[in-house]
Amino acid sequence: MKQFLDFLPLVVFFAFYKIYDIYAATAALIVATAIVLIYSWVRFRKVEKMALITFVLVVVFGGLTLFFHNDEFIKWKVTVIYALFAGALLVSQWVMKKPLIQRMLGKELSLPQPVWSKLNLAWAVFFILCGLANIYIAFWLPQNIWVNFKVFGLTALTLIFTLLSGVYIYRHLPQDDKS
């Protein structure tokens, strides 16, 4: 259910883009993200930090896109979110000395410290590369290609990287946790 809720604003954005244009899609994205946030609060009495940060960035960059009637702002949102995620992962590892991935999953999984560090660093690099790919595609290729990349490309890349992370984690689980 949570994954569906997280994906819903993206589907709404894509549908409105195909039916109308980038500005209608941006307005729909803002509304859909707000609805998902409100629903999460009403239904679960909890809103995750990442969802709240994403909402704020959607409102700021989406609002700027609509106010200035300039799609470059909404295109930057993707890279800014990925940069923030990568930054949080790197700061947690190098400054706070405990990888964010470990803080998030450490209660459910027992992994050696080097595995947590490598996994955390791998996700940081993944987010950096996705942010850079977004810059290239958003500003060097046609808008419709960027929309398809944002909706399908980044989603597929994230799913694949999540599966690869799962394989990496499984390989390093203690034998009794693998069953």
From Swiss-Prot:
Entry membrane topology: Multi-pass membrane protein
Transmembrane intervals: 22-42, 50-70, 76-96, 121-141, 149-169
CC annotations in GO: plasma membrane
Keyword terms: Cell inner membrane, Cell membrane, Membrane, Transmembrane, Transmembrane helix
Location relative to the cell: Cell inner membrane
Main location: membrane
Pfam family, one: IspA
Disulfide partners: none
Role noted for this protein: Plays a role in cell envelope biogenesis, maintenance of cell envelope integrity and membrane homeostasis.
Protein family membership: Belongs to the YciB family.
HAMAP family: YciB
Protein name as catalogued: Inner membrane-spanning protein YciB
